[in-house]
């Protein structure tokens, strides 16, 4: 079983990202779970969401405390939240940032085996006209993890958002997939 933990802020779409990733894996015939955890429920407050993906039915119902993958939608969280808490030794961290690998690693309390960086904010602004990075970051997740194909992510996005909005969000995911930089740490 692969466990993914998303870190974002209220209004950024972390919960939607967790759900879309689960749908993309479901499209590929995998068993999935996706669920949020809210602390203080207000726009801008830190939000955590979770996705589990497996080849067999998932019976566990707890939060994810030892993720295989951590996805950070808002780079300012690197300053205030230990996003790598419990990260497995061979874990992957995916960050929406324009900063360098060195700058990001300096902020992480635990070093991942693999670090993936993409400027999802710029991609979202250029593609959607809004700094909502949830769909763009899923392109980075597909590239960095290989858990799902980018085509499945695009299909799941279009299933979630109809018409032109779906097309634009799928385009953002594809662009992030192509622009994600991956580093072995």
Swiss-Prot record:
The superkingdom of the source organism is Archaea
Q: Where are the transmembrane segments?
A: none
Root EC class:
oxidoreductase
Has keyword Oxidoreductase?
yes
Query: Cross-referenced InterPro entries, in alphabetical order?
Result: Oxidoreductase_gamma_subunit, PorC_KorC, Pyrv/ketoisovalerate_OxRed_cat, Pyrv_flavodox_OxRed_cen
SUPFAM superfamilies according to UniProt: Pyruvate-ferredoxin oxidoreductase, PFOR, domain III
List UniProt keywords, sorted A-Z: Oxidoreductase
Tell me which EC number(s) this protein carries: 1.2.7.1, 1.2.7.7
Q: Which GO terms describe its molecular function?
A: 3-methyl-2-oxobutanoate dehydrogenase (ferredoxin) activity; pyruvate synthase activity
Record field: catalytic activity: 2 oxidized [2Fe-2S]-[ferredoxin] + pyruvate + CoA = 2 reduced [2Fe-2S]-[ferredoxin] + acetyl-CoA + CO2 + H(+); 3-methyl-2-oxobutanoate + 2 oxidized [2Fe-2S]-[ferredoxin] + CoA = 2-methylpropanoyl-CoA + 2 reduced [2Fe-2S]-[ferredoxin] + CO2 + H(+)
Q: How does it assemble?
A: Heterotetramer of one alpha, one beta, one delta and one gamma chain.
Give the protein's recorded name: Pyruvate/ketoisovalerate oxidoreductases common subunit gamma
